[in-house]
Amino acid sequence: MSDIIREIEREYMRSDIPAFRPGDTVRVNVKVVEGNRERIQAFEGVVIKRQGSGINETFTVRRVSYGVGVERTFPVHSPRLASIEVIRRGVVRRAKLYYLRERTGKAARIRERRLARPEEA
């Protein structure tokens, strides 16, 4: 039975999702329907958690807008997501960054992960 469910879920899984982790800054482009029009709205912020697996996987992005913290949770494999871009990679030691909710300004900064340079030929 679970093989049938897994097979059906595999059809709906997206393959164009980049690898990202909590601490990374991402820009999520979401398809928004307004009346009979559809437009793309960008939401940029820090990934504070990623949970679930398979088709049920979600991630939460946090940003501060006009001094107010805004968190938005997206299903990873949703057809409403136009694209996900990784802006910066962050260095964190936790899988859930709930402690960022209490921090503001410089205290909420996350160090950038430096990637190994490709060797010059």
Curated annotation (Swiss-Prot):
This protein is located at the 30S-50S ribosomal subunit interface and may play a role in the structure and function of the aminoacyl-tRNA binding site. The keyword Ribonucleoprotein applies. PROSITE patterns: RIBOSOMAL_L19 (PS01015). It comes from the Bacteria. Belongs to the bacterial ribosomal protein bL19 family. SUPFAM superfamilies: Translation proteins SH3-like domain. One of its GO terms (cellular component) is cytosolic large ribosomal subunit. The keyword Ribonucleoprotein applies. Keywords: Ribonucleoprotein, Ribosomal protein. This is Large ribosomal subunit protein bL19. One of its GO terms (biological process) is translation. Gene3D superfamilies: 2.30.30.790. One of its GO terms (molecular function) is structural constituent of ribosome.
